[in-house]
Amino acid sequence: MTAVLELRDVCAEYGPFRALFGVSLRIDPGEAVALVGSNGAGKTTVARVASGLLAPSSGSVTVDGEDMTGARIYKFARAGVAHAVEGRSVFATLAVEENLTLSFRRVHGRAGVKPSLERAYELFPVLGRRRGQIAGTLSGGEQRMLSLARVMVEVPKVLIADELSLGLAPVIVDELYETLTRLRTEGTSLLIIEQQVSHALALADRVAILDHGNVSWLGDSSEAKAVVHQAFEPA
C-alpha cells in the first residue's frame, strides 16, 4: 500500500539549530496517526516539513508516492495535504467569509470558492452564522474553527492538525474532534499532533512518540496508551 503521506529519514534545521534527526513516519489511506511528545520535542517542525512550510535539510517527503521534498506549500495543498497550524491562524481584521475566500481562491482559483465555502459552513455552522463578522472579534474556539476551515478547500487526502486543543475549553475541543472524526469517515487521513493527548489517542490507529527530534516509539494506539499517559499526562 502506498502511503498517503510519508517522511523518510528527515532532518530539519533552523539556522545552526537541528530540530529533527532522521524522522521517519508514514500515514496510510484512511489512517489516523497521533504524534505526541513534550513541548519542544519537534512536533510542529514535523508538521511544517510534512506540509511544505519548511524544507528538510535531508531526507524525503512523499504524497501518494510522489516526491514532494522541498516543494512549496501550495503544491502540497493541491496534492491534498491540509495543514491546520498551531494557534489561531486568521486575518484578524477581515470578515470570516473574506478569510475563507482568500484561502480557497489561492489554491483553486475563483471557481473553487463557492463549493469550498458551502463545505466550510456545513462543517462549522457557527461560521456560516458569523460570515460577516470580523475574525478578530470571534471567540478563541471560533477562531480555531476558522483556521481549520481555511485549509478545508475540499475533502483533503490528509489533514495535519497541529495542537488543535491548545488553549480551548473542553466543550470546544470536543466539537473540533467530532469534525475530525467526520472527516475520517469521509476518507481523510489524519496526522494529529498534540501535547494533551487524550483526544488524539481515542481517535488514532497508531501513535508515534517524538523525543528531542527523534521518533522514540511507534506502535498501535492500544499498546501506546499506558506508556504515553505515563510520559506526558500530569499525575
Q: Could you describe each region identified by the protein language model?
A:
Residues 36-38:
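The feature captures the beta-strand-to-loop junction immediately N-terminal to the Walker
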Residues 151-152:
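ABC ATPase C-loop
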Residues 15, 71-73, 96-115, 123-128, ...:
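ABC-type ATPase nucleotide-binding domains, specifically the catalytic core motifs of the NBD
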Residues 134-138:
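Conserved ABC ATPase signature
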Residues 159-163:
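Catalytic Walker B motif of ABC-type/P-loop ATPase nucleotide-binding domains
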Residues 55, 67-87, 110-117, 129-132, ...:
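ABC ATPase NBD coupling module
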Residues 51:
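Helix-to-loop junction immediately C-terminal to a conserved catalytic motif
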